[in-house]
Structures are given as structure tokens and as C-alpha cells.
Amino acid sequence: MVDHKRIPKQVIVGVSGGIAAYKACTVVRQLTEASHRVRVIPTESALRFVGAATFEALSGEPVCTDVFADVPAVPHVHLGQQADLVVVAPATADLLARAAAGRADDLLTATLLTARCPVLFAPAMHTEMWLHPATVDNVATLRRRGAVVLEPATGRLTGADSGAGRLPEAEEITTLAQLLLERHDALPYDLAGRKLLVTAGGTREPIDPVRFIGNRSSGKQGYAVARVAAQRGADVTLIAGHTAGLVDPAGVEVVHVSSAQQLADAVSKHAPTADVLVMAAAVADFRPAQVATAKIKKGVEGPPTIELLRNDDVLAGVVRARAHGQLPNMRAIVGFAAETGDANGDVLFHARAKLRRKGCDLLVVNAVGEGRAFEVDSNDGWLLASDGTESALQHGSKTLMASRIVDAIVTFLAGCSS
């Protein structure tokens, strides 16, 4: 039986002429290492920053530069027709303008017109150019036509400038590229005007200056939800506990915390303005009653006894606050449950009980175990709703899982509005 998910995809990487063109090399390398066939189409100005030989060495494929290089092959038609995905990184203000206008004055823009696959633009330009009304209109036009235009990162630009307009990290671009290949369609821009509050990662409760109580959460699933929601138009705030060295998603406000109390305080601060809470963080249930100011020594009397106190349930607290009218904007509350079966019942038995106990609108359920849920890049599980409906979340990347979760949130919000 053929595993279609493992069949290499045809990916075109378009590179336009900006200083960030050198970062396209990492995008090409990562997509190639993911076993995709990558064809690079640089603009003439892009080749002034990075030579064709570099792209050919990284992709293992000849670089395509000229509509007339192989006239019988009609490259400006066939490249777009055969592609499973087109990624343009970096996409300059000029490239976005030409794409929005439907220009076909070079091989890259001509290929964009013939492509029938998802198209992903990763913009890079100075802040003033990104915020200019012309660029804003061009981006809106491309999104309206179904293209995915990433929000640029904020940081150091060329020269001494700093601000919004920096090319998103290569990992960000390739992660979303892989999602588009898994979804087989573009990401809808359907969360514009919505504010999402997402928590991710694990908390740490200090025992002494060296030791802490923690858990195995990597934060990958929560980060993926924040990333996907932002690229679907949401205004996202991500409250991040300890993670596996993850790159902060572009276009997302990230608040870093350590302990359960810090996370609870951050949620209390940001929840009043949020439409949706996605509680993906693994929050410690207990904390030491006292934190030692010096490292606890082994001693000769045996291991020390540590008295524990129960932490407040952050998710249940938000549900109560909404019920008491304290969160009038909150339309959807999404919880997460990492469960194992036991003598009393299976994973879903415990998950259904948790949904009733917590009172959230949606509950994402993962069965945990060796090589499952924690510290891995893929996931599966179930999605339970407060109305009793249940659906399976088929195995896939955590980014694909995030996309399905966001799909469910959009559907739930539509039901609230009807």
C-alpha cells in the first residue's frame, strides 16, 4: 500500500531581490531534506545577492531563471502546473505588488499566474514599506485570492533600522509550507479581528535554587496553534512556559513565564480582551509549600520530605470568571487533556469526565505514552465538545493538528454568531 504522505512533493521556491535572499538557502535546504523536489526560481535581482550555483547545490536541481531558456518546455506554464506548493521567500514589496497586479514580466510572476496549488509568501522589507497603504492593499488582495501571506517578524533590519518587516525564520516558513502540503489547500484568512490567548509549554515549581518540579511538555503543540491562528488573521498572545528551545512565532506577542502562578497571572491579565483561550500549557498541579534558599544536601538521614500545595486550576478559573460575567468578550475556551487509561476507564472515559468537570467548550485529548504526545513532532487524539459531539484527530504533524484545532474554533465561533 502506498503511503501518499511520504510521496515527495514538487515545491517551487521563488526568491526575490532583497538582502534576506541569503536566508532562502536555508529554506531550500530544509525543504530538500524533507524529501521534496525543490526547484528554485530567483528573480534577476535575487541573483545579485545569491548565485545560481548555490541554489543548485542545495536543491540538486537546475535553477530556473528565464522564460526563454527552454522555449519548447514552456517553463512558465509547466512549472506552475506541476507544483504542489509555491513558496516565495523573501517576497519584497515589489514582488508582492507585481503578484497582486497579475503581472507576468519574469519567470517567477508568470509561474505564480499558472500555479493551481497553494502559494505562500514570506515578506521581507523595511517597516515603512510593509505598512505603506499600497503594500497593505496588495497583501489584502493576495489573501483574498487565497494566497497565504505570512506576517513578517519584528527585529533588526538592514543598517541600523529595527521593526516589523524582517523575514520570518526559515523554520517558521518551512513549517507552514509543510502544513500547506499536508492540508492540500491554502490557509483561510478567517480570524481577522479575533483575539486569541494561547498558553504553551510546561511550568516549573522551584524546590531549591537547583531543583524544580516540572513535566515533559515541549510547548510544540501550543506554539503550533499560535502560529496557525496568527497566519489566519488572529491577533495572538502566546503565554509560554518552558519549551524545547522553540522559535517565537512571527506576528505573535510572546509572554515568557516560569511557574504556574506566573502563568495564571499572565492569563488573568490578557483574558479580559480575548475572544478565545486555548489552554495548551502543561501547568503543574502542585508546588512545594516552601522553597529552600540553599541547595538541599543529600544528608545522612535519607531523602527530605517535601510538603506540596495544590496550585489553582487556571482553566477552571477562566470558566468561572466567564460564567460570572467577568469575561464578556470570551466566546470559546479550549482545554487540553493528556490522559492514560486505568482500571476505572479508558482515555476517553477520563477525558469526558474532565470536560464535564472543567466546563470548557472544547477539549483536545491526547493519549500519552512512550513516543506519544510529549517531546515529538507529531500527534493525534480526539476533540470533544460541550454539546456532546466527538471527533477523531488523525495522526499528523503538530502543525496539522493545530490547523484542525483552529478549524474547530472557527466553526464554534460561527455557531456562537448565528
UniProtKB/Swiss-Prot annotation:
Keywords: Decarboxylase, Flavoprotein, FMN, Ligase, Lyase, Magnesium, Metal-binding, Multifunctional enzyme. Residues 1-195 are annotated as: Phosphopantothenoylcysteine decarboxylase. Residues 196-418 are annotated as: Phosphopantothenate--cysteine ligase. CTP binds at D285, K295, F336, K354, K358. InterPro entries: CoaB-like_sf, CoaBC, DNA/pantothenate-metab_flavo_C, Flavin_trans-like, Flavoprotein. Pathway: Cofactor biosynthesis; coenzyme A biosynthesis; CoA from (R)-pantothenate: step 2/5; Cofactor biosynthesis; coenzyme A biosynthesis; CoA from (R)-pantothenate: step 3/5. It comes from the Bacteria. Binds 1 FMN per subunit. One of its GO terms (cellular component) is plasma membrane. Signal peptide: none annotated. Its EC number is 4.1.1.36, 6.3.2.5. GO terms for molecular function: FMN binding; metal ion binding; phosphopantothenate--cysteine ligase activity; phosphopantothenoylcysteine decarboxylase activity. Its cofactor is Mg(2+); FMN. Catalyzes two sequential steps in the biosynthesis of coenzyme A. In the first step cysteine is conjugated to 4'-phosphopantothenate to form 4-phosphopantothenoylcysteine. In the second step the latter compound is decarboxylated to form 4'-phosphopantotheine. Required for growth and persistence in mice. In the N-terminal section; belongs to the HFCD (homo-oligomeric flavin containing Cys decarboxylase) superfamily. HAMAP family: CoaBC (MF_02225). Was identified as a high-confidence drug target. This is Coenzyme A biosynthesis bifunctional protein CoaBC. It comes from Mycobacterium tuberculosis (strain ATCC 25618 / H37Rv).
